[in-house]
Amino acid sequence: MGIKQIIAIASAKGGVGKSTICTNLAFQFSKDFNVGILDADIYGPNQHILLDVSESKPEVKILDGKKSFIPIKVNNILLNSMGFVLDDDKAAMWRGPMLSGAIKQLKELTQWGDLDYLFIDMPPGTGDAYLTVASELKPNYVLLVTSQSKLAVKDTIKSKSMFERLKIPIIGVIDNMSYSVSFQSGEVVPDFSPIDLEHEIGLKILGSIPRTKELTAFNPEISSNFFETTYNEVLQIIE
């Protein structure tokens, strides 16, 4: 069977919570499906940190004369990450061809087994990494993550344009850090001046996630509180 569908989680702007969205969405899918995460963010891999497996390393085996990685299994998710390859305290200074080759090898040398969905945590930007994913990893869909800041929205529109040119279907957009909740009154407080994101970006908003300290780290006990609706929206589109 192999991997049935690949979903890239992407944002042109860094710092909008793409990795956190990827982790939580994959966890929701893992309740009903076989799921993996490929952390392809070579400049700032975070999945091994979010899933609290920083001290772990994928087992390396030789299969058919080739080196293979056995992914880490955590919270019913199979994970392989550039974070297992790179030093946490050192910057990756790789040029485009090296970056592209590393992402391709990480996916191909990992023994994923039979997966319903493989989520790819993309690097921010619209450069070589995007082209590699499109041409080599061939995602079935991409899901964009943004905040409502003017700069993030502008860059999300650029990212949308690139994926359209690459002919990769875009599921929609997740509006992250959209609002806060007052601890005193429970009142929902928008973090930005309200804008019509669907009109600005031209894509369906599949969920609005709050800015809350509970989501700065992955917590499976509260994940469903924030992501179950988004999970159902995404699943309805891709199934």
At which residue positions do the language-model features occur?
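Phosphate-binding/switch loop-helix module in NTP-utilizing enzymes
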Residues: G83-V133
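Conserved nucleotide-binding/hydrolysis micro-motifs of P-loop NTPases
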Residues: I42-Y43, V85-D87, P124-G125, Q148-A152, ...
